[in-house]
């Protein structure tokens, strides 16, 4: 971010910290910052050397260490271009650099944990319902609402991409462009790692499959919509699963691997894993497409250990939207709504770093973002300000004192 015109006395880095920390602490509205700007403890966290604001140059700002909601509003409305005639767009975003920053921050965290033999890149698009007439607003038939269709890409808990997309286009549009940007960065940060792409049936497209195999040279495990030809391939297994269910009275699943090619759209035969399952409610066949081959990757392993694990990504998206307000896309402009999504993403990266490093070895090592906030961040304390320091005095009866101390010690061990 940069200031196109000197309209604010507050540095961009302060505005970034102010808003990102506010999101992490649960303050979703800019109005909340009109109260936070007078909090010396919060000002110290943001990095202000004058946490009381007594040294501000302007009389109207004196006593306020941080920016108010109007300045933050101009910050959030920042676009990719500024204009001297537009008083609300004087803070300009270098959007390509923000995208790179999100990827870089997460990859640096991954590198601190060492290079694993294999990582999974999980892509998914979700709905972001809209209740106004925002730029890029379209009706989506599947979700039965006006919405955006943000594309998220994760590797485990690590956010690599958060792209706000209008819902008038296919959910998989743009994923190749994002992967072209992300995969070289992964190979640079984690040399020698094997990369496997995971996705739902929305990503089962010839152009994506061929690009992954022929150009990116990475493997994939992708959900496939069932059809009559696929069901015929596992008809015997479905009958056997039903028979076993009738005999034993408990769910039964049988896996089968086979090679399959569509009549028109695919360029080659590809390996499909069929799951023939019978439950109380009846038959439940599923199919996934993969480039992983036997004997190292059996049908059971591919489905149960690799594909089913991608369900965790849904939890990470929930954290983005429910805990960190990535669905607060209520400004008129698509660009400023994208900026809000990125700010929520950076707040997530901050909290995930807490979870991965500070809370490692504690009972909160897998806690959700809102649980970390509630138990470790938003706690009562006495704030005292001296000439040189800001003192925080916590209650001796604070119930999570032991976890707080362990988190503090773990953070001190990190060498950046």
Where are these regions (language model features)?
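Basic, short loop/linker segments at the boundary and entry of helix-turn-helix/winged-helix-like folds
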Residues: 1-17, 173
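Short, conserved catalytic/metal-binding motifs centered on acidic residues
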Residues: 18-19, 33, 72-75, 117-127, ...
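Short amphipathic alpha-helical "interface-anchor" segments enriched in bulky aromatics
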Residues: 245, 300-339, 343, 347-355
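An anionic, glycine-rich sequence signature occurring as long contiguous blocks
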Residues: 219-322, 409-416
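A short, flexible helix-boundary coil/loop motif
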Residues: 350-416
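Active-site-proximal, Lys/Arg-enriched surface segment
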Residues: 50-51, 55-151
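Short, basic/hydrophobic alpha-helical segments
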Residues: 100-110, 176-195
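Electropositive, glycine- and tryptophan-enriched low-complexity nucleic-acid-binding patches
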Residues: 141-190
């Amino acid at each position: 971010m940069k200031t196109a015109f000197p309209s604010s006395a507050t540095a961009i880095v302060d505005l970034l910290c102010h808003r990102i920390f506010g999101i992490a602490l649960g303050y979703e509205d800019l109005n909340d910052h009109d109260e936070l700007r007078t909090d010396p403890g919060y000002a110290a966290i943001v990095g202000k050397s004058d946490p009381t604001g007594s040294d501000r140059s302007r009389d109207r700002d004196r006593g306020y260490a941080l920016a108010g909601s109007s300045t933050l509003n101009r910050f959030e409305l920042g676009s990719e271009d500024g204009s001297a005639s537009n008083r609300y767009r004087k803070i300009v975003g270098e959007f390509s650099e923000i995208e790179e920053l999100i990827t870089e921050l997460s990859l640096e965290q991954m590198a601190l944990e060492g290079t694993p033999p294999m990582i999974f890149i999980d892509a998914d698009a979700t709905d972001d319902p809209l209740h106004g007439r925002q730029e890029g607003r379209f009706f989506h038939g599947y979700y039965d609402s006006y919405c955006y269709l943000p594309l998220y890409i994760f590797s485990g808990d690590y956010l690599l991409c958060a792209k706000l997309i209008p819902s008038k286009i296919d959910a998989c549009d743009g994923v190749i462009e994002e992967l072209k940007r992300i995969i070289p960065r992964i190979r640079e940060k984690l040399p020698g790692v094997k990369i496997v792409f995971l996705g739902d049936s929305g990503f089962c497209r010839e152009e994506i499959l061929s690009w992954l195999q022929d150009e990116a040279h990475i493997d994939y495990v992708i959900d496939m919509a069932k059809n009559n030809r696929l069901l015929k391939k596992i008809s015997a297994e479905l009958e056997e699963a039903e028979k076993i269910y009738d005999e034993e009275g408990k769910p039964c699943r049988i896996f089968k691997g086979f090679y399959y090619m569509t009549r028109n759209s695919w360029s080659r035969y590809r390996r499909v894993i069929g799951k023939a399952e019978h439950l109380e409610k009846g038959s439940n066949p599923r199919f996934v497409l993969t480039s992983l081959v036997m004997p190292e990757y059996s049908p059971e392993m591919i489905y149960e250990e690799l594909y089913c694990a991608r369900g965790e990504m849904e939890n990470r998206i929930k954290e983005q939207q429910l805990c960190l307000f990535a669905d607060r896309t209520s400004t008129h402009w698509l660009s400023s709504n994208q900026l809000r999504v990125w700010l929520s993403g950076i707040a997530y990266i901050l909290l995930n770093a807490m979870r991965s490093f500070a809370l490692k070895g504690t009972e909160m090592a897998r806690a959700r973002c809102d649980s970390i906030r509630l138990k470790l961040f938003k706690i009562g304390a006495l704030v005292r300000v001296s000439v040189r320091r800001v003192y925080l005095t916590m209650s001796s009866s604070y119930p999570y004192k032991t976890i707080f101390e362990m988190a503090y010690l773990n953070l001190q061990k990190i060498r950046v």
